[in-house]
C-alpha cells in the first residue's frame, strides 16, 4: 500500500501555502466557509461540529474556532453532514458507454469526486491514442480522474485478436504524467506467478507507484507468489473466505458492485473497524441506466449502511480515505486542514442523500456541467473513426455441425457473475439434452478476416432472437448470442453498419440498437439520452427471455479469457482454468 506522501499528486505552490496558512491562522479572509454543518469523523467515529474553512482548492481549517472567521462567501449547509468526496478505486469508464466528459457530468453531482480509471478498453481497440485521449480528458476535468497505465493489452497474449498493442516503451512514456497513479490490473496472473520476465519488467517499472491486481478465486501458494511479485490489491474476489485470505496476506480488497459482477453482498461482512483501511469500493463496470436510477459509489455506501449495518464512519471511510491512502493520494480522503476541499454535503447520511458537492474548493452545479458538456467534449478531441473492419455476414457463417450421440462443451452463465462454469450437453436428432442451449459466436473486427469462432451457451435465458455487441472484453470483437443463425447475422450486420454498438433482434427484425461511434465502445449522447436508450434495449432484450439483469454487460465478459472457467474468443473456446484452448466436442 502506497502510504507515503506522493508529491507527484499534491500540486501546491509556496504562494498557495502562504495564503492557506494565513487563512488557517485567522490572518486572512477565506474564499468559502461552510456553516451549520457537522463533519463525519472518519478516524475516530462520531462527528465534529463547526464550520469548514476553504481557501483556493484546500481546507484551511475545521471546527468551532472558526465560527467568526471572515469569508468572501458563506454556504449554509442547513444542518447537513459533511463527508469527503467519494472515490471509485477501480473502473473502466468506457464500460459506462459514456465519454469521460459525460461520465463526469453524470457522477460528480452524486458525490463521486475521484476515480481511478484503467482505460484498457479503448487501448485494446486504439492503442496509445486511446490512452492519450483519456489523459486529455483527465487534464481538463473538474472531477479528479486518475489513470492506471493499462498493463495487459491484450488481456492474454496469443488468445485473441485485438486492435492495437501497448508496449512497455509506450507505457513508460505515461508513467510520470501527473494523472497517472500506477500500473493497472495485471490480468495475466499465471504469467506473473511463473516469473515471466516481460511481466516482471512492467511491475519493476511501476513499483514506486501502485500495482493493481486481478486474481479471481486464486489461493494457496499461487496467491502467495502473486503477492510476492508486488501486486497490492484485487477487485475480482467473489467469495467471503477468498477475500479474507487476501486481506490476511496483506492485499487490499476492492469490493466490487458493478452492473454484472455483484460482489458486495458476499464481501461486505468482512468489513470492520480493524481492516477497513485495507478495504475499498469500486464499480469496475456500471452502465448509465443504473447510474441514473440507483447511483454510483453512493449506491454502494447506502447498501453497506442499510443492508449490512456497517457503521457510518466505516462505510464512508472505505468510500474515500482508504482508497486515497492506498494510491498515495494523501491530499484526498479526509475533511482536514491542508486536504483538498472535495466535500459532499448530505441531508441524510444514512440514505446518502446528496445535497451539495464541492470539488477542489468550488461548488458544483449540475446544470452548468450539462450546459458545458458538448464544448468540453469537443475540446478533448475524441478519436472518432470507424474501427469495424469487418464485412457483412450471412447465416451460413454461423453454421455448426453436430453428430448425434456426441457430447459438446457448453459455456454456462451464472447470472450477475463474471465467472462461468464449463458443462457439456449431448446432441441427438431432437437437439441437445437441455433446452436452454443457445449459440454464441465471436467475430474479430480488426481486418484479419477470420471465420467466426462459434460455441454453445447455457443458462443465459435466451429463448428467441439474438443479441450482438462490439463491447466484448477485453479485445472488443463482435460477440453475438442467438437461437437462429439468420437472426444472429441480422444483429451482427446492424452493429457493423452502426460502426459499433449494441443490437437486439427478434421475430426477424431489429427491435432496438445503440450506435457507439467512439471505438465501438462509447456514445457521444448525454447521460440521460444514453440511459433512455439502454432502457429501450433492455426492454427489447427482456422480450427474448429471462435474461440476466444486465444482459449486454454479462455478455461482454463471455470473451474474457482471464476469468474462469470457459470462454470464447475470436480464436476459439478457451479453458480459463487450464489457460489453454479446448475443443467444442468433448473427446476425453
Swiss-Prot record:
Cofactor (UniProt): Mn(2+)
Broad enzyme group: hydrolase
Catalytic activity entry: adenine + H2O + H(+) = hypoxanthine + NH4(+)
Keywords: Hydrolase, Manganese
Pfam families (UniProt xref): Adenine_deam_C (PF13382), Amidohydro_1 (PF01979)
Single Gene Ontology BP annotation: adenine catabolic process
InterPro entries registered for this protein in UniProt: Adenine_deam (IPR006679), Adenine_deam_C (IPR026912), Amidohydro-rel (IPR006680), Metal-dep_hydrolase_composite (IPR011059), Metal_Hydrolase (IPR032466)
Subunit structure: Homodimer.
Family membership noted in the UniProt record: Belongs to the metallo-dependent hydrolases superfamily. Adenine deaminase family.
NCBIfam families: ade, PRK10027.1
Protein name: Adenine deaminase
Originating species: Escherichia coli (strain 55989 / EAEC)
Amino acid at each position: 500500500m502506497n502510504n507515503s506522501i506522493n508529491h507527484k499528486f499534491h500540486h501546491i505552490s509556496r504562494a498557495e501555502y502562504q495564503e492557506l496558512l494565513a487563512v488557517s491562522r485567522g490572518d486572512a479572509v477565506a474564499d468559502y466557509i461552510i456553516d451549520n454543518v457537522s463533519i463525519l469523523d472518519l478516524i475516530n467515529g462520531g462527528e465534529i461540529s463547526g464550520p469548514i474553512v476553504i481557501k483556493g482548492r484546500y481546507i484551511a481549517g475545521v471546527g468551532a474556532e472558526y465560527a467568526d472567521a471572515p469569508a468572501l462567501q458563506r454556504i449554509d449547509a442547513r444542518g447537513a453532514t459533511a463527508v469527503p468526496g467519494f472515490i471509485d478505486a477501480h473502473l473502466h469508464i468506457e464500460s459506462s458507454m459514456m465519454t469521460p466528459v459525460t461520465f463526469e457530468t453524470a457522477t460528480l453531482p452524486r458525490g463521486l469526486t475521484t476515480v481511478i480509471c484503467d482505460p484498457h478498453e479503448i487501448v485494446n481497440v486504439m492503442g496509445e491514442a486511446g490512452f492519450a485521449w483519456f489523459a486529455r480528458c483527465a487534464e481538463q476535468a473538474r472531477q479528479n480522474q486518475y489513470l492506471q497505465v493499462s498493463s495487459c493489452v491484450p488481456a492474454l497474449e496469443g488468445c485473441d485478436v485485438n486492435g492495437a498493442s501497448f508496449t512497455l516503451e509506450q507505457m513508460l512514456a505515461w508513467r510520470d504524467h501527473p494523472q497517472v497513479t500506477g500500473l493497472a490490473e495485471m490480468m495475466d496472473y499465471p504469467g506473473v506467478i511463473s516469473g515471466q520476465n516481460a511481466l516482471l519488467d512492467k511491475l519493476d517499472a511501476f513499483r514506486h507507484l501502485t500495482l493493481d491486481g486481478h486474481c479471481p478465486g486464486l489461493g494457496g501458494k499461487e496467491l502467495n507468489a502473486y503477492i510476492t511479485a508486488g501486486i497490492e490489491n484485487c477487485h475480482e474476489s467473489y467469495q467471503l473466505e477468498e477475500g479474507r485470505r487476501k486481506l490476511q496476506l496483506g492485499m487490499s480488497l476492492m469490493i466490487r458492485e458493478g452492473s454484472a459482477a455483484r460482489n458486495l453482498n458476499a464481501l461486505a461482512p468482512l468489513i470492520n473497524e480493524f481492516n477497513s483501511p485495507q478495504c475499498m469500493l469500486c464499480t469496475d463496470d456500471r452502465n448509465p441506466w443504473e447510474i441514473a436510477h440507483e447511483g454510483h459509489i453512493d449506491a454502494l455506501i447506502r447498501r453497506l449502511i442499510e443492508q449490512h449495518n456497517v457503521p457510518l464512519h466505516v462505510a464512508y471511510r472505505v468510500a474515500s480515505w482508504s482508497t486515497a491512502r492506498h494510491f498515495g493520494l494523501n491530499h484526498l480522503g479526509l475533511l482536514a486542514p491542508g486536504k483538498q476541499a472535495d466535500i459532499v454535503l448530505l441531508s441524510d447520511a444514512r440514505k446518502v442523500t446528496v445535497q451539495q458537492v464541492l470539488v477542489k474548493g468550488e461548488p458544483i452545479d449540475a446544470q452548468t456541467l450539462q450546459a458545458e458538456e458538448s464544448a468540453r467534449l469537443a475540446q478533448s478531441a475524441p478519436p472518432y473513426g470507424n474501427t469495424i473492419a469487418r464485412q457483412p455476414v450471412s447465416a451460413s457463417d454461423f453454421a455448426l455441425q453436430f453428430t448425434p450421440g456426441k457430447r459438446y462443451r457448453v459455456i454456462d452463465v451464472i447470472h450477475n457473475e463474471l465467472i462461468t462454469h464449463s458443462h457439456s450437453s449431448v446432441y441427438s436428432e431432437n437437439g441437445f439434452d437441455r433446452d436452454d442451449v443457445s449459440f454464441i459466436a465471436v467475430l474479430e473486427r480488426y481486418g484479419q478476416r477470420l471465420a467466426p469462432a462459434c460455441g454453445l451457451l447455457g443458462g443465459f435465458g435466451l429463448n428467441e432472437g439474438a443479441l450482438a455487441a462490439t463491447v466484448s472484453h477485453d479485445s472488443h470483437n463482435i460477440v453475438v448470442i442467438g437461437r437462429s443463425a439468420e437472426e444472429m447475422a441480422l444483429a451482427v450486420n446492424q452493429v457493423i453498419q452502426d460502426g459499433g454498438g449494441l443490437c437486439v433482434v427478434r421475430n426477424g427484425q431489429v427491435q432496438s440498437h445503440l450506435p457507439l461511434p467512439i471505438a465501438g465502445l462509447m456514445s457521444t449522447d448525454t447521460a440521460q439520452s444514453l440511459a433512455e436508450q439502454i432502457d429501450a434495449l433492455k426492454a427489447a432484450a427482456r422480450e427474448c427471455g429471462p435474461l440476466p439483469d444486465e444482459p449486454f454487460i454479462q455478455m461482454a465478459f463471455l470473451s474474457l479469457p482471464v476469468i474462469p472457467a470457459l470462454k470464447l474468443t475470436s480464436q476459439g473456446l478457451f479453458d480459463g482454468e487450464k489457460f489453454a484452448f479446448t475443443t467444442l466436442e468433448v473427446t476425453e
